[in-house]
C-alpha cells in the first residue's frame, strides 16, 4: 500500500489518562515513526508515518485509546510521507 503520513486530533477525556504514553507504545509496536503531544484545548495530536495498513490500525486504536480514556472523536488527515522521523516520541 505504500508509506504515508497521518495526522490525528483526538478529542474527549484524553489528557491525564496515559494517552500519549499508550499511543507511543502502540505506534512503536506497529513500526511507526512520528510524535504525540497534548494540545492546549485538551485534545491530543498525533503525527505518524509508516505503512498505510499500520496507520489504519493506529487510527482504530486511537478511537478506543487506553482504558482510562473516553474518546469522543478522532479527526483524521492523510498526508504525504516525509521521512522526517526516525522514532516515535512524546513531545510538547
UniProtKB/Swiss-Prot annotation:
Domain of life: Bacteria
Active-site residues, as the UniProt record annotates them: 20, 38
Entry EC number(s): 3.6.1.7
Domain Acylphosphatase-like: 5-92
GO molecular function, one term: acylphosphatase activity
Alphabetically ordered keywords of this record: Hydrolase
Catalysed reactions listed for this entry: an acyl phosphate + H2O = a carboxylate + phosphate + H(+)
Pfam families to which the protein is assigned, alphabetical: Acylphosphatase
Enzyme class: hydrolase
InterPro entries hit by this protein: Acylphosphatase (IPR020456), Acylphosphatase-like_dom (IPR001792), Acylphosphatase-like_dom_sf (IPR036046), Acylphosphatase_CS (IPR017968)
Family stated for the protein in its record: Belongs to the acylphosphatase family.
Protein name, as recorded: Acylphosphatase
UniProt source species: Sorangium cellulosum (strain So ce56)
